[in-house]
Amino acid sequence: MRIDKNSRGTLALVFGISAIIAALLIVFVRIPWIVYPVVALLLWFCIWQLAFFRIPVRERKGSDRLVTSVADGRVVIIEKTYEKEYLKQECIQLSVYMNFFDVHANFWPVDGSVDYYKYYPGEHFFASKPKASEENEHSCVGIVTPSGQKIFFKQIAGGFARRIVCYAKWHSTSRSGEQCGIIKFGSRIDIFLPLDAEIKVEVGDYVRACETVLAELKA
């Protein structure tokens, strides 16, 4: 099992604090009905953190026309909107919300090259709120495919997410199925697609990064 390279410090801190708490309980408290449940809870929390920050092995379903999900989660928005930062035109917004139990590693949605990148520090409202897209901490990535189609996506931090990691670099290659970053704890991904893209999912669907095709771009 691979662990996200930017999360190893977080895991070391979690494991260290958990080990100290467990040791103090065992040495000083010595009351089984207190010690055993707390130690079990700490162990469960450490295992959950490992699962949370792992990089899953997935079958690659995307291409330069098939747009796959950037993250695991549930589709909460599919609507027509105006994207003013990169596309600068009417488009389709598709948003995926990640809860605490979803893998939070993010993956490139389509083959192409990075045409735009910008990071914004910001607030930490709950990611399910509409204003989170603009006011929360977020990073923005624009991708142009070999056929000239453009898509845009945002990694949005949530109420508990306090750090966004994005590996995008201007003019670097994006290949669907490869990791592009991670958001630590509950968060959201907004993807902006051309109006003529054929949407393959519906609001309420659970999607998986790399494997679930969100849309097909016109040739």
List each model region and its residues.
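Contiguous, well-folded functional domains in the mature portion of proteins
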Residues: M1-A219
